[in-house]
């Protein structure tokens, strides 16, 4: 297959020819960084191609189950295809539906999302649904919905543009959730952070903060990025 049709990782292939959202660094970072310790039930909101869900399946053992939710029909079908074709298909389940309308009858230990941007001031992920829903939904809406499905000791992790992440952290202060982890993503050494992975919990624990730099001053992958992604990238 050509790169326009999909992306080959070490243990799985992600087809994205039918999905507006292609494989990108944001999804790879979320799938590689999300804290999987003691997580048996995981949910990926707005899964797109299913990339993050499949990465989490690779990182966890046979006792962990991963559910994924996607509204857009083409993306949903692509995610189903990718999950079925992976070596982890028996632990992956893709559902079609709107995050704000869907009903899960279980709790999750980890809920992750690389969500639409929900803002005219930020570049859209180009999903067909974004244009229709951006005016009525927000990242806070998704966070509050995720809270309903969160196990008592569970964690929610979103990857967002830096300003959107800061806004969500501020908005979350009255949500009954606590921001427990912040990972600032810096594309190149010396630049300001452009992305952030923010994690929330119902438990008020000390905030953990860290930074990840992707490229060094010579435009080479940093050692930290290599270590983080070497289980996934073919040539890492």
From Swiss-Prot:
Disulfide bridge map: none
Enzyme class: transferase
Reactions catalysed: adenosine(37) in tRNA1(Val) + S-adenosyl-L-methionine = N(6)-methyladenosine(37) in tRNA1(Val) + S-adenosyl-L-homocysteine + H(+)
Gene Ontology cellular component terms for the protein in this record: cytoplasm
GO molecular function: nucleic acid binding; tRNA (adenine-N6)-methyltransferase activity
Location of this chain's protein in the cell: Cytoplasm
InterPro entries: DNA_methylase_N6_adenine_CS, SAM-dependent_MTases_sf, Small_mtfrase_dom, tRNA_Adenine-N(6)_MTase, tRNA_adenine-N6_MeTrfase
Coiled coil: none
Keywords: Cytoplasm, Methyltransferase, S-adenosyl-L-methionine, Transferase, tRNA processing
Pfam families: MTS
UniProt superkingdom: Bacteria
PROSITE patterns hit by this protein: N6_MTASE
GO biological process, one term: tRNA processing
EC number: 2.1.1.223
Coarse class of the protein's main subcellular location: cytoplasm
Family named by the database record: Belongs to the methyltransferase superfamily. tRNA (adenine-N(6)-)-methyltransferase family.
Function recorded in the entry: Specifically methylates the adenine in position 37 of tRNA(1)(Val) (anticodon cmo5UAC).
Name of the molecule in the record: tRNA1(Val) (adenine(37)-N6)-methyltransferase
Lineage start: Bacteria, Pseudomonadati, Pseudomonadota, Gammaproteobacteria, Pasteurellales
